[in-house]
Amino acid sequence: MIMNMKNIFYCLLPGLLLGACSNKVYEKTGDSVIVKVQHKETGGPRLVRLQVMGDKLIHVSATADSKFADPQSLIVVPQKKQTSFAVVQNGDTITVSTEEVKASVLASTGEVWFTDKNGELILQENKGGGKTFTPIEVEGTKGYTVCQVFESPEDEAFYGLGQHQADEFNYKGKNEELFQYNTKVSVPFVVSNKNYGILLDSYSFCRFGNPNDYSQLNRIFKLYDKTGQEGALTGTYVPKKGETLVRREDSIYFENLKTIENLPKKLPLMGAKVTYEGEIEPAQTGEFKFILYYAGYVKVYLNNEPVVPERWRTAWNPNSYKFAAHLEAGKRVPLKIEWQPDGGQSYCGLRALTPVNPEEQGKQSWWSEMTKQLDYYFMAGENMDDVISGYRSLTGKSPVMPKWAMGFWQSREKYNTQEEMLGALKGFRDRKIPLDNIVLDWNHWPENAWGSHEFDKARFPDPKAMVDSIHAMHARMMISVWPKFYVTTEHFKEFDENGWMYQQSVKDSLKDWVGPGYHYGFYDAYDPDARKLFWKQMYEHYYPLGIDAWWMDASEPNVRDCTDLEYRKALCGPTALGSSTEFFNAYALMNAEAIYDGQRGVDNNKRVFLLTRSGFAGLQRYSTATWSGDIGTRWEDMKAQISAGLNFAMSGIPYWTMDIGGFCVENRYVAGQKQWNATKTENADYKEWRELNTRWYQFGAFVPLYRAHGQYPFREIWEIAPEGHPAYQSVVYYTKLRYNMMPYIYSLAGMTWFDDYTIMRPLVMDFTADAEVNDIGDQFMFGPSFMVSPVYRYGDRSREIYFPQAEGWYDFYSGKFQAGGERKVIEAPYERIPLYVRAGAIIPFGDDIQYTDEKPAEHIRLYIYQGADGEFTLYEDEGVNYNYEQGMYAMIPMKYDEATKTLVIGERQGEFPGMLKERTFTVVTVNKEKAQPFDLNAKGVTVKYNGSEQTLKL
């Protein structure tokens, strides 16, 4: 039940400020202040509460009821009660003050605003209160559809919200629907360039920006077909064989299994070509925002201009793309959609939102379909890192990942036999290509036994020996585990007899795509006992084999592809906590809790690693990374992963990855691979496939987790290109470089725990004062030192780069200096990605290794990029256990002073079992006068280090 808010963009309380209240209108209770709203309007709050969570953290609650419901938060961990704050009433304004921030409530409306300790405004709710409550009842449970709006200055920018696929970076003035789906991970948290964050504590379907649903075209436009007749567009359906069908279409809405029934009944979509064309006439002037939903190939033309160049997505996992157009009231504009469906079942839709006043569109607006009360957390910071630190203090710290997780991961859909998997690993070792992890995807079980956690003995005759062999080759193994169970398995029955299995798919006799199709269900991860059973079954079947990591697939949960929203809710509910309308988005968080708590409960000395296809606020506390799902193998998909990964990082969850090369493969690439296999000739498509993978690997080497995966063609580099090919050479170069960088990378992993650091960083995090970076979503920092600029267009051998305002930058490959505050077109040959190092960087590089724990880093090359002061802390621990939580780790602080050209390698702090007592540093300097390329054999100043402070004049 989605609230109908016709033509309302922001949630405006119409009440006027009716004067000051002379009486005390608040109640202080421990760590909170409750304000009774004096002039409640229909749909407004009756109570507003400010709860102090820390000097920079304020929890705001509001309710339209006479008391707060206070449901248990799924995302906020238990907090120490804060009582050190002051409360002052001045007229009808009640102000709560900590040492760092002030939060005020206007008792006449419930409006809240936040300032720093000096009274400078940080954030203000929409004038008049900005909060509305509309009653909703689902499955006998009452709640509210809520909306919260904040004022926003013109120069503000917003980041976060999880990771989405529309290739949007700065969400200022944008709209995003927050729900979980394959390739779409929603996190209700944003960070502002004004150095604050807002976390909405809601688990239902939400919207950021315009709270209205996109409308069918005929509801906001007059439609004209290609002959000029009013009332519809013209739909022309040309099958591969047979007669062309032409009919009038009053909407383009074929977006799910239900609505594609409205396509022409006798039209075979396979090989068809479809055109929707005519004219649209708006009733008002302004910017209309469109959303295109597509599977197959699609193009969109508006006013005879291409507004959506060709895009593609596989039929079973459609994608959305957004665009905007300024249209004038009463003026007819040509519209044309060209669609080539993918397969016999495919999807296409185009909907739109009517214009909104730009000032209102630019505000920060949140809408939640169902919640008991409004709850959000305000966190202020000195910078964006400080804001994210506040987020993690609320939702949980991010543990140090196992060191091997920072190496290279090889995966494919899928290794069908034990021999295939071991053969792939042996291929890396024989070719001396570094690797730490190999992955076994779904379908390693007997065909009719999904969820049994058993191996198909014909294909995997000895799983324990397989895992042992992987370990003997100094690699780790991750295995795919789903929350899905065939109804015939004992595991399903064990859940079902306790009432812990979602029933709708069973009642509807849904079958999956395997073999003849099998009946199945998903377990309810919201039930704590069900979570314990989920881990117990994994522990009994998988854990004794020595498996190192867990791949939580379909954790949205994606019970069935391509269903409408209401049926999706039916398939994943009711939950143990309530209706799936209220608890729609947090499944992956609950599922991750099952594995993390389960493994730490049985083996607290082995670091947990989870990779999940979905996520939610707080996911980081369960040692869980997210990958961006089953994305397409297209250049536009590769580009979209840059902004997706950056916004996911800004959502407070530091570990993210993607399928390098994309998952779903266009048929032309498959045909190119088969031609190569048969004839060793490279056609145009296969040439592009190789370049696409090369550019994607170059990008992937600089994200938190470096991982290749996808459907056929196989993704091992020697399957993509032979050893002498530039694609092969480039991928091997960056894989080896990743391992040379391991002292740097693992130190970043340590910083995520100790300093709440973010590894993959949009430029705005480090250069907030430089307004030029606010909208740059295709460059990023990898840690404090490297600026990465992926190449994402076929055939490009250069790209424009903005160099943020800093003391300077150095080309990593040549060592040449580049000034900051400039835009330049930089060469990007096939084999190289533009990579620059910030002046002041101190970067530790290790020797060539084949896996992360091959040997201790006895010799480290310290590259000092002069031109600015710099510092870095080398972090080390045992790499595989939780002893660091007990203080068993070592840090070596390093500082460079530009004025004196002095490097101080500080006294080592801490120790751990197996720690190197002594090592050698070779210090290599790079400066404007000496363009020193990166070279492991470069000469420098050698220092013997035994843990005592060393000072070097450079």
From Swiss-Prot:
Residues 227-366 form the PA14 domain. Its EC number is 3.2.1.177. The active site is at D553, E556, D630 (proton donor). Pathway: Glucan metabolism; xyloglucan degradation. PROSITE patterns: PA14, PROKAR_LIPOPROTEIN. A lipid is attached at C21 (N-palmitoyl cysteine). GO terms for cellular component: plasma membrane. GO terms for molecular function: alpha-D-xyloside xylohydrolase; carbohydrate binding; hydrolase activity, hydrolyzing O-glycosyl compounds. Gut bacteria supply the human body with energy from dietary polysaccharides through glycosidases that are absent in the human genome. Xyloglucans are a ubiquitous family of highly branched plant cell wall polysaccharides present in the vegetables we consume. Enzymes involved in xyloglucan degradation mediate the conversion of otherwise indigestible plant polysaccharides to short-chain fatty acids. This is Alpha-xylosidase BoGH31A. It comes from Bacteroides ovatus (strain ATCC 8483 / DSM 1896 / JCM 5824 / BCRC 10623 / CCUG 4943 / NCTC 11153).
